[in-house]
């Protein structure tokens, strides 16, 4: 289960578009599951940080990721509910998952000039609470 402000969610491809309504849920493992990837346009707060949290109430665990939206303007969610290969990727990034050539081609590639420096702020908060029992 995700805890996040309302924001735009953009599917990477037709497979993700078919699963858009369930972007915020992790499905049961399936042998025929095909990975889905979503781009999130998360709003930054007054401090320039954007964030998202994912939690499992049954286990009482929660992860919150906050990042500097100015230097990491993209947030990518990779969802794979394949039996035997179950995984979730939560990735603040300054690039897309389409590759460098695609980013250069569409004008979104970022470059660091000679002598330039860039700061990336990332905060990971891991919390454990008492599990919620049905």
Residue spans for each PLM region:
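Active-site pocket scaffolds in enzymes
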Residues: 58-134
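Active-site/ligand-binding surface loops and adjacent short beta/alpha elements
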Residues: 1-69
């Amino acid at each position: 289960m995700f805890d996040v402000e309302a924001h735009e969610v953009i599917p990477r491809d037709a497979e993700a578009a078919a699963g858009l309504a369930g972007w915020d849920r992790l499905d049961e493992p399936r042998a025929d599951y095909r990975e889905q990837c979503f781009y999130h346009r998360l709003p930054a707060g007054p401090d320039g940080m954007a964030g998202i949290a994912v939690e499992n109430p049954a286990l009482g665990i929660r992860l919150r990721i906050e990042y500097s939206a100015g230097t990491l303007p993209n947030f990518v969610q990779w969802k794979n509910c394949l039996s035997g290969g179950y995984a979730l990727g939560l990735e603040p990034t300054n690039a897309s998952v389409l590759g460098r050539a695609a980013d250069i081609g569409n004008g979104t590639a970022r470059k660091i000039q000679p002598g330039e420096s860039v700061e990336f702020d990332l905060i990971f908060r891991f919390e454990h609470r008492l599990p919620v029992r049905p």
